């Protein structure tokens, strides 16, 4: 019964950080997908000039 009371009182302290970590993971996976597309895109496929930064970070 005591464990059930602790879970009932503190569930938000577990779910909020888990949601943050899950969102961070999904954001990283989406960035990987967009980076893979950038490398195949004709717009960004050209050779960069010397000392030129990438156009899409």
Swiss-Prot record:
Membrane topology: Single-pass membrane protein
InterPro entries per the UniProt record, alphabetical: NDUB1 (IPR012575)
Record field: transmembrane: 10-26
GO annotations of cellular component type: mitochondrial inner membrane; mitochondrion; respiratory chain complex I
Keywords associated with the record: Electron transport, Membrane, Mitochondrion, Mitochondrion inner membrane, Respiratory chain, Transmembrane, Transmembrane helix, Transport
Keyword match Endoplasmic reticulum: no
Pfam family, any one: NADH_oxidored
Top-rank taxon: Eukaryota
Keyword presence, Transmembrane helix: yes
N-terminal signal peptide: none
Compartment(s): Mitochondrion inner membrane
Function: Accessory subunit of the mitochondrial membrane respiratory chain NADH dehydrogenase (Complex I) that is believed not to be involved in catalysis. Complex I functions in the transfer of electrons from NADH to the respiratory chain. The immediate electron acceptor for the enzyme is believed to be ubiquinone.
Family the UniProt entry places it in: Belongs to the complex I NDUFB1 subunit family.
Quaternary structure note: Complex I is composed of 45 different subunits.
Protein name according to UniProt: NADH dehydrogenase [ubiquinone] 1 beta subcomplex subunit 1
Lineage, uppermost ranks: Eukaryota, Metazoa, Chordata, Craniata, Vertebrata
